[in-house]
Each structure stands twice: as C-alpha cells, then as structure tokens.
Amino acid sequence: IAIDSTTIKSLTYSNIAKSNPRKNYIEAFTQSNKLSKNEIQDCIIVEQGLVKESMRANIFVRFDNIVITPKIQSNILKGVFRQIIAEYLKAENNYVFKESEISVNDLENADEIVLVNAVIGANLIEKIDCILFPKLENYRAKNHELYKLFNELFNNNLA
C-alpha cells in the first residue's frame, strides 16, 4: 500500500524473506527507487493481510485512546525509536498500549496513523491509496496527539 498525499499506488512484496529483516530492507531500498519515480513517499509492508511496518519505519495506529503497533516478529526490525515509544506508552496512563496484529481493514477506522524511525522522527499519515485517515473532514485541523507526542519524544531522546 503506497503512502502519499497525491498519488494512488499499490505495491506487492512477494519475494521478501520472512526470516531476515535485513533482506526486507534491501528489498525496500530496491523498491524505493520505484516509489520515488512515482512520487510516493513510503510503502506499508503487508503480509497475509496484516500490517507489519513501512519500508522505512515502524507503524503506530490510534483508535481513540488505544495505541497499537505490530508485535515484533522475526521479519520486523526492532526500531530504537519504536522501543522508546513502547516503553513510554506502557507507563503512560492516558493510553492503552498494545502490541497486536493490525489488519489492512483496521487502518480504515484509525483515528491516527504515525510512522516512526530514529532518523526522521514521526510522520503523520494522511492518506493511504485513496483512503483519507480518518474519514473526517476536519482531520487536518484535528489535534494530532500521537504525532506531537512522538516528535517530542524524538527531540528529547534522539535528536
């Protein structure tokens, strides 16, 4: 699933080795050349209908006060920033934090989707393919609480 504010694209990752995260990123780097030619910023890796991560970052999805990120498995790189956020959210009383499966269909009902990595910090996702998140006209004006929180954590811990 391509992530971009203007272009609608979808990519399939059929040859990613499930047991080697480094191979995932080699494939992601190869695919990123195709993305840049199509003005797509990133791509979500989906395996058997479940969201794993993006090509460049870990993913966090918020539904009201519940924040979910995919469980770390052998095919997901353990992100430094992901770990900082997970530890913070586990101690934070304002959110219920879960490491759980996220289906592609779950993304359509999200209140907020944020990609994070230790180099770029947090990126708020506004559109995946032709779906705007969430399906509310005032989303851009809405208080993007996770996005702001994650960037604050990034600035305090990694910048």
Spans of model-derived segments:
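Helix-start/capping segments and mature chain N-termini
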Residues: I1-A159
